[in-house]
């Protein structure tokens, strides 16, 4: 329990470090590895004013993510536990893309030995739909929360077995693997929700 809690290292998108000083202060209170998610890169590229800006942003993302992979590898060797929210964001009702798992998760499956899928049913924070991108605008309310976990899953076996079910012509097997993980999360969440 307590020993494990001291060894948790969260994966945090760079938005938590850059967008708001107060959010950054909270994020810095946790041990974390910062990544540049592909979803953020896609948004940044769409906002880029020139091809040079796009190239610079891609280079920045590669640099951050390479450093993150090295840091995660060190965490693994040091016996630390990596905490990842596989969609990389909070679920927003009416925005199904916020429930889609990030393709990068496949790299983590190849890197780590085991995983446990943890679901949280219920939330004491509600997204303020007038300010959905501002975490500080979230509304706080009482809630019953139920945390549940899957059995321990061997990452490499899980990935290998699932990839074997895909046709050879599958265009994006990495995304399919994380889509399958998200399906398992949904099943686990629905099962607990019926009990809550």
Spans of features found by a protein language model:
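Catalytic core of membrane glycerolipid acyltransferases/transacylases, capturing the structured
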Residues: 1-57
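Non-catalytic C-terminal accessory region of glycerolipid acyltransferases
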Residues: 49-196
């Amino acid at each position: 329990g307590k020993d494990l809690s001291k060894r948790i290292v969260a994966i945090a998108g760079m938005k938590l470090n850059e967008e708001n000083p107060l959010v950054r202060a909270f994020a810095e209170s946790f041990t974390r590895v910062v990544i540049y998610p592909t979803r953020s890169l896609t948004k940044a590229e769409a906002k880029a004013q020139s091809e040079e800006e796009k190239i610079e942003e891609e280079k920045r993302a590669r640099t951050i993510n390479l450093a993150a992979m090295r840091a995660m590898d060190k965490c693994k060797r040091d016996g630390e536990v990596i905490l990842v929210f596989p969609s990389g964001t909070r679920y927003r009702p009416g925005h199904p893309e916020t429930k889609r798992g990030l393709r990068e998760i496949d790299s983590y499956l190849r890197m780590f030995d085991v995983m446990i899928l943890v679901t949280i049913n219920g939330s004491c924070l509600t997204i303020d739909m007038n300010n959905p991108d501002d975490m500080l605008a979230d509304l706080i309310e009482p809630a019953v929360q139920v945390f549940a976990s899957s059995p321990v899953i061997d990452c490499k076996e899980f990935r290998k077995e699932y990839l074997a079910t895909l046709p050879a012509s599958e265009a994006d097997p990495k995304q399919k693997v994380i889509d399958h993980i998200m399906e398992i999360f949904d099943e686990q969440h629905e099962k607990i929700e019926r009990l809550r």
